[in-house]
Amino acid sequence: MDTSSEGDHELAPNDISFNTIPFSLNFHPTEDLLVVSDAEGRLKLFKYSLDENEVKLSLRPHQSGCRQANFSSDGKYIFTASSDCSMKVIDINTGSILYTREEAHDYPINCLVSKEFMVFTGDDEGTIKVWDMRQQNIVCEFQEHGDFISDITTIDDRHIAATSGDGGVSIYNFVRKSMDDISEKSDNELLSCLSLDNGQKLVCGSQDGSILIYDRNNLENVKKFAGHPQSVDALVKVNNNTFFSGSSDGIIRFIGLRPKKLLGVVGEHSTFPIERMAISRDNRYLGSISHDFSLKFWNVASFYEEDESEDADSANANANEIENDDDDDDDDDEIEDIENATKVDDDSGSEMGDDDDDDDDEEQEEEEESSSDEDIKRKKPQQNPIKAQQIEKQKQKQNQKRSFFKDL
C-alpha cells in the first residue's frame, strides 16, 4: 500500500493477498502476529512488520468455511468456528489441534468471541452459546433471536451483547445465565455491534447503512442516524466516543458518537465490501479484509494519540456540545452527508443526519447526558482505595492463573 514520506509514524506493513475471500481477522494480544481465516476452511498466522509479512503457520482445520479465528486472551491458542458447526482449539506454536467439538452448534457458526477463559459463539439460526474452555463445556445458551447472530461484543466481565439478522440487539448476563434485555426489531438486519461510553451505549451497524445507538440500560431508547450509502458490516472502537466503521461501499470511516460527526476517512478497498476489521495490540495498525481478496494495514496511531490527549477534556466538551445542540440542528441541512465524503480535512467534520428529531426527546437526552458528565467530573479526581486494593488482588490472581489447557 502507499505510504507517506513523513516517517515511520505514517508507515504501515504491505498488503497481504489471498486466493479466496478472507472471513475473519484478529490481532495477537501481546505480539506482532495476526490470524486470518477464509472461505475454504484455512487459517494463516502472520508475523507482520514494515519490512515484510511472514507466514508463521498455515493449516486447514475445517473442510467448510472457517468463519472465525480468534486468539485466546493469553495468546497461546487460536479458537476457530466453522460453517460445519464445529469449534477447534489450535496451539499457535505447533499448529496442533488440541481440542475439537464436532457439533458445537446444530447450525453453522457465524460468530466467535473470547474473553479470558470464556468463549461466546452464535449461529445461523439465532442461538448463542457460552463456553468455559477450562472444562470445554457449555455454561449456558440463549435462543432469543429468530435469525442469524451477526456479531457478539463483550460489555464487561459479566455481560455480552449480540446483534441479529432479525433486526434486534440483546444483552446477556452470562454469570447469572440470564438475558437482561432485548430490543424491538428494526426494519433492517443488524450486522455489527460495539460497546462505547463505558459500556453505557451500544453502537450497531445495519443493512441499510444507518447506525443505531442504544442505551444499554434501556434498549427501547434508541437513536438512529443515516451515514453510509451501504451496509455497515464492521466496527472497531477507538475510545469511548469514537470508532471506525467499515462499509460495503469499501470505505473505512472515523466517526464521533457525541456529537455525531464524520471525523475522517481512513482509507478504502476500492468499491469492494469490507468484511472485517481489527486493531493491533499497540493501537498502531488497523487491519481490514475485503472481497478484493486482500488484507490492508492502515496506520491509525495518530487517531488514538489525538483521542488520548482529548480524554481529559471530553466531559467539558460533551457538556458544551449538548448545550449547543439546538443551535447546531439549524445547520444540519447545510452539511454534506457522510456517504458523499471521499476526502476530509483533519480539522473538520461533517454532521451525520439524525432521524430522531423530537424536541422532547432531545431535551431529555441533554439532561441525562449533562448529569452523566457532571458525575464523571465529580468522580474523576479521586481514586477509591478499596477499589485499588481489589484491582491489585485481581492482578495477583491473574498472574497465578494456570493455563486452562494444561491438561490437554
From Swiss-Prot:
WD repeats lie at residues 17-56, 61-100, 104-141, 144-183, 186-224, 227-265, 268-308. PROSITE patterns: WD_REPEATS_1, WD_REPEATS_2, WD_REPEATS_REGION. Residues 308-408 are annotated as: Disordered. Residues 322-339, 347-373 have a biased composition (Acidic residues). It comes from the Eukaryota. SUPFAM superfamilies: WD40 repeat-like (SSF50978). Keywords: Repeat, WD repeat. Belongs to the WD repeat WDR55 family. This is WD repeat-containing protein 55 homolog. The gene is wdr55.
